Amino acid sequence: MNFETVIGLEVHVELNTNSKIFSPTSAHFGNDQNANTNVIDWSFPGVLPVLNKGVVDAGIKAALALNMDIHKKMHFDRKNYFYPDNPKAYQISQFDEPIGYNGWIEVELEDGTTKKIGIERAHLEEDAGKNTHGTDGYSYVDLNRQGVPLIEIVSEADMRSPEEAYAYLTALKEVIQYAGISDVKMEEGSMRVDANISLRPYGQEKFGTKTELKNLNSFSNVRKGLEYEVQRQAEILRSGGQIRQETRRYDEANKATILMRVKEGAADYRYFPEPDLPLFEISDEWIEEMRTELPEFPKERRARYVSDLGLSDYDASQLTANKVTSNFFEKAVALGGDAKQVSNWLQGEVAQFLNAEGKTLEQIELTPENLVEMITIIEDGTISSKIAKKVFVHLAKNGGGAREYVEKAGMVQISDPAILIPIIHQVFADNEAAVADFKSGKRNADKAFTGFLMRATKGQANPQVALKLLAQELAKLKEN
């Protein structure tokens, strides 16, 4: 029997506000344990939450970017549960009326087709703290993350393969990043994914029993975990067994999912309206103000790169996959850089350098200005493409102007025949055996002089000019 895969994803995204959702403490990642806390985060008696307007701004932008309807009458709810990293014993979230609902996003699949994935809801909530279990037998609680604003984006169960889930996450990350509401860095926990997966016989409308997958710390692991679950569940069903409703985690080392706990039934969080936060209304004017702050999104930008700048679909997709890279490209082209040349450098030498150094584009000294200047002095013959690679490394590490560095470092390409011809004659004088081979008609003897000349000029001879002059002088040599 063949089965249809049914997948839905729950994605938690940390919003990049300066302060937390209900307290004025910093929401910055990476500070010392419990440095970003105050009496609200510790839930001292009598303290009251105050909603951060920037969080609602970000929620509206997310809803608009994901084609969602917006609940204009806003309220929050208490989700009650006890855990050491949750000192209030409840989480302030949104239950029955999330800020956004009934949305969708279009994703591009590997075969070039597109598919629209529904988004059930997006709700605002506060993050919990973090427990660390020490080797000394103690558990430690860090509340820096407590109260950091989150938006949880819940998809419809519209994905029918791990590939589609991967494509959905890729598209969602792009949209959130371009909207400017999160840096969506999974390695820092600012984007976290839980997956629900079930199988059902083809043609059956009723969903099968679902399994929830956790510990998915990369898009690649989401895909691998789902692929494993498809195989595991299919084998159980084909052997006549039944799928249990359970939570499993993906074990990267064993490339398998491992049971965490069996779910007996739905958890009862005893939601009720948050009494310490008043109801308020999101006006049409507020929504339109947020709409005007949204940028051009990746899909539209890719289309423009192809139609207006003449880039290939592949180049356009690579450039727009990251907002920082795309914005860098935009500025470089606006400064007069050739779109194809800028694209080639960003996808080639720049990408290789970043991978080797373990850095991002923002962490190096290369700017759109000095990249365009470097491309310009390649095109006008000041430096060769080979020398340009050395110039780029200097710019990436030290910044500054490309032309100024080239002139100070003595890297200017030699194109003047009055300089090159005497060097060619000296090459002939220094390599009498090669000259004899050439005059005797030895096959490919002329090619040795190209290497001699480039070594004599330390690679600074303009290849086109140098080869033309070399051929000219070799012809004279043969005549004599």
UniProtKB/Swiss-Prot annotation:
EC number from the UniProt entry: 6.3.5.-
InterPro entries xref list: Asn/Gln-tRNA_amidoTrfase_suB/E (IPR017959), Asn/Gln-tRNA_Trfase_suB/E_cat (IPR006075), Asn/Gln_amidotransferase (IPR018027), Asn/Gln_tRNA_amidoTrase-B-like (IPR003789), GatB (IPR004413), GatB_C_1 (IPR042114), GatB_Yqey_C_2 (IPR023168), Gln-tRNA_amidoTrfase_suB_CS (IPR017958)
GO biological process, one term: translation
Enzyme class: ligase
Sorted UniProt keywords: ATP-binding, Ligase, Nucleotide-binding, Protein biosynthesis
A GO MF label: asparaginyl-tRNA synthase (glutamine-hydrolyzing) activity
Reactions mediated catalytically: L-glutamyl-tRNA(Gln) + L-glutamine + ATP + H2O = L-glutaminyl-tRNA(Gln) + L-glutamate + ADP + phosphate + H(+); L-aspartyl-tRNA(Asn) + L-glutamine + ATP + H2O = L-asparaginyl-tRNA(Asn) + L-glutamate + ADP + phosphate + 2 H(+)
Keyword Ligase: yes
Function: Allows the formation of correctly charged Asn-tRNA(Asn) or Gln-tRNA(Gln) through the transamidation of misacylated Asp-tRNA(Asn) or Glu-tRNA(Gln) in organisms which lack either or both of asparaginyl-tRNA or glutaminyl-tRNA synthetases. The reaction takes place in the presence of glutamine and ATP through an activated phospho-Asp-tRNA(Asn) or phospho-Glu-tRNA(Gln).
Protein name as annotated: Aspartyl/glutamyl-tRNA(Asn/Gln) amidotransferase subunit B
Gene that encodes it: gatB
